[in-house]
Amino acid sequence: MDIYMSRYEEITQQLIFSPKTWLITGVAGFIGSNLLEKLLKLNQVVIGLDNFSTGHQYNLDEVKTLVSTEQWSRFCFIEGDIRDLTTCEQVMKGVDHVLHQAALGSVPRSIVDPITTNATNITGFLNILHAAKNAQVQSFTYAASSSTYGDHPALPKVEENIGNPLSPYAVTKYVNEIYAQVYARTYGFKTIGLRYFNVFGRRQDPNGAYAAVIPKWTAAMLKGDDVYINGDGETSRDFCYIDNVIQMNILSALAKDSAKDNIYNVAVGDRTTLNELSGYIYDELNLIHHIDKLSIKYREFRSGDVRHSQADVTKAIDLLKYRPNIKIREGLRLSMPWYVRFLKG
């Protein structure tokens, strides 16, 4: 028997029979909309908050087509901004579990616009954290980031060992962790921070200047455009499929008190180079949609990027019974049909 997945299955069954009320911030985004889909399919009541700065209405529209009419009726969407404390207080009424995903992501974006990144990721986080504490919610899980490891050279990355931040974005996500720790010590309000490592999957936006590498390259291949690799292509990352992230959010929300007031890596524990990744995407895409050729162009390394990233997920496995069951190749295979539909119509 797979004890790790049985814990996740046990929790999801428990939720079906005893529904809770959830708040998802950033609900119209990539991760937020996937959490929404999963929770509605578990017959949960969900309040969603988004200001559409990076999220999209079409993500919510898609979720609506994937759940029943009754399940969709349990969803209440509020268009609002986490930078407004009053909004955060209003959406928190009656909430059991908070999944805080709203943020301005992207290292390059934070270098171009550190002021807005700070306002959203630090002030916005503090507003949601404070409102949740005052509302006495049962759990508060927030999206942290692997960027917090900064220039620390050790591999794999262990939660306790971090270096100096390499971008304004990394600073904001680290400040989130510090605030969470202070709220636990000062107010007894315990949270769980999830350090995401290069999450990918369905509904990850391929458009825009700050698109992540997998959707950006997938779109380029489908259009017959060049694939641009920053540096020599030997930069490596621990790519984590969206279903692993959903699992960790739900495990965290229903975690025992002894596992709270903690930070956990959310990844697979593997390392894939950009050169390998481009080949994997090409292979998986070609299985369902013919690609004439793969044209790769190399350019300068990107400012603020770390050379290698790989997570140690032992802590999540031990304390939360996490099981990163979907690896990079399977995750890409599951993702490609969505991208073909989205980009080819």
From Swiss-Prot:
Thermal dependence summary for this entry: Optimum temperature is 37 degrees Celsius.
In terms of SUPFAM superfamilies, this protein maps to: NAD(P)-binding Rossmann-fold domains
**Residue numbers binding NAD(+):** 26-31, 50-55, 81-82, 101-103, 120, 169, 173, 199
Cofactor binding: number and manner: Binds 1 NAD(+) per subunit.
Show the InterPro entries listed in the entry. Answer: Epimerase_deHydtase, Lipid_A_modif_metabolic_enz, NAD(P)-bd_dom_sf
- Record bears the keyword Nucleotide-binding: yes
Give the catalytic activity. Answer: UDP-N-acetyl-alpha-D-glucosamine = UDP-N-acetyl-alpha-D-galactosamine
Record annotation: effect of changing S309Y = Abolishes epimerase activity
Q: Which Gene3D superfamilies match?
A: NAD(P)-binding Rossmann-like Domain (3.40.50.720), UDP-galactose 4-epimerase, domain 1 (3.90.25.10)
Q: Does the keyword Isomerase apply?
A: yes
Residues annotated as binding substrate = 145-146, 196-198, 213-216, 228-230, 237, 302-305
What pathway, per the record? Bacterial outer membrane biogenesis; LPS O-antigen biosynthesis
Q: Which domain of life is it from?
A: Bacteria
**EC number(s)?**
5.1.3.7
Single GO molecular function: UDP-N-acetylglucosamine 4-epimerase activity
Q: How is this protein's function tied to pH?
A: Optimum pH is 7.0-9.0.
**Which metal ions or organic cofactors does this protein require, according to UniProt?**
NAD(+)
* Record function comment: Catalyzes the epimerization of UDP-N-acetylglucosamine (UDP-GlcNAc) to UDP-N-acetylgalactosamine (UDP-GalNAc). Has very low epimerase activity with UDP-Glc and UDP-Gal. Plays a role in the biosynthesis of 2-acetamino-2-deoxy-L-altruronic acid, a building block of the O-antigen in bacterial lipopolysaccharide (LPS).
Subunit composition and interactions: Homodimer.
Tell me the protein family, please: Belongs to the NAD(P)-dependent epimerase/dehydratase family.
Q: This protein is called what?
A: UDP-N-acetylglucosamine 4-epimerase
